[in-house]
Amino acid sequence: MTALFPFDNSFARLPDRFFARVAPTAVEAPRLVRLNRTLALDLGLDPDRLESPEGLDVLSGRRVAEGAEPLAAAYAGHQFGQFVPQLGDGRAILLGEVVGRDGRRRDIQLKGSGPTPFSRRGDGRAALGPVLREYLVSEAMHALGIPTTRALAAVTTGEPVIRETVLPGAVLTRVASSHIRVGSFQFFAARGDVEGLRALADHAIARHDPEAAEAENPYRALLEGVIRRQAELVARWLGIGFIHGVMNTDNMSIAGETIDYGPCAFLDAYDPATAFSSIDRHGRYAYGNQPRIALWNLTRLAEALLPLLSEDETKAVAEAEAALTGFAGLFEAAYHGLLNRKLGLTTMRDGDPALAGDLLKTMAENGADFTLTFRRLSAAAPGSGPAPEPEAVEAVRSLFIDPTSFDAWAERWRRRLDEEPGSAAGRKALMRSVNPAFIPRNHRVEAMIEAAVERQDFVPFETLLTVLSRPYDDQPDFAQFAEAPEGGGRGYRTFCGT
């Protein structure tokens, strides 16, 4: 019989100081909540075997699969601006890597699988609520077209975990292009371990930026690749109203994937100062701050890479600064290009950033819902065909406390659309493809978690997962899931769940 996971491991070949070899801790009575059968097939796995007792034992950590080399990775990181020289996987264990049907290499990691040498007096376990949140939101992000880690399985353990209260335990099987973080490089830089730093950088180049190996300065090319991916990723976050909530350097993947969903949330009423995380007391990681924080984190990566950029410190700093100066242009191009598409614009004119910015300003002043405003604009967009239905225009106006403020902006928008090529139908299709009808509304996510944790009712989880798998379709039978919460979601708080 073939192996359950056809592991082909590369990170485990690195020197021992990169990780601690540790096996998952067995649990008493695991039960499969959800297997992502589609993802399993994409990875070349057999979903039926994964759902069998054999598969459940591996997905819960009761048994180590054939070919697995379980380990907890070492890394450091800046947490809310303060450097911590040793963090590491405190409740996650990398089982190994598989190469999917598309030829891409992915990590298979268990979260909540027990203590590791990096647990820092923690129990290494995860509660059911955070596991379901990450499963649901990461899969929703994938459906929205945002680069992200994925969820292969969620399993309850049959054991309690002690947090503020006693909660049911769970294990998430996470799939990622890798788990190399900015903090991974900081770990070696902080120790003056240049050879370890070089080995990690060479591994990262081979895995994520193979073309960088041929560059004049491969390590600068690696840095530039990470900068580009992060600039594009954060622009896409802003485009759907996503707030990560804890953008520490140990939570920034060099693969350019969204990772670590602990206190994440989505905008309801548009306000760039929105920060939902209970531990983000000063709004460091607020929605509108995310591009600035991304650059701050990337600057920390550049600092860590200085010994590799050049043996001459002055030249190394110049190389790092030259790479970092590219972030602003990359982000602005990605962000304003996305905003233009959200407004039905396929060409870029000098006044377009101001047009989009003025809409956002008007939305903030009027408490307009971010997702509903852009989705309803899709139906209200004028064009060379028939005028939009009055009901479609009124549906947008009704989102603004002062509808006349929207009217003034909409007139400018209509004049700008008159300059665009293409048909009204094509414009509407474009807008609908980038303006989702459905996002993981915070109040819906909380209701789903409450049902599962308090009543062992997983129907809301399954329903929400189904709806969010088609975020750009209207789905009239599930229209209630597109609705904004009362009060625009103000006062909502998220918690890390560790």
Swiss-Prot record:
InterPro entries: Kinase-like_dom_sf, SelO
Superkingdom as given in the UniProt entry: Bacteria
Natural source organism: Methylorubrum populi (strain ATCC BAA-705 / NCIMB 13946 / BJ001)
Keywords recorded for this protein, A-Z: ATP-binding, Magnesium, Manganese, Metal-binding, Nucleotide-binding, Nucleotidyltransferase, Transferase
Residues given in the record as Mg(2+) binding sites: 251, 260
EC number: 2.7.7.-, 2.7.7.108
Protein name (record): Protein nucleotidyltransferase YdiU
GO molecular function terms attached to this record: AMPylase activity; ATP binding; magnesium ion binding
Residues engaged in binding ATP: 88, 90-91, 111, 123-124, 174, 181, 260
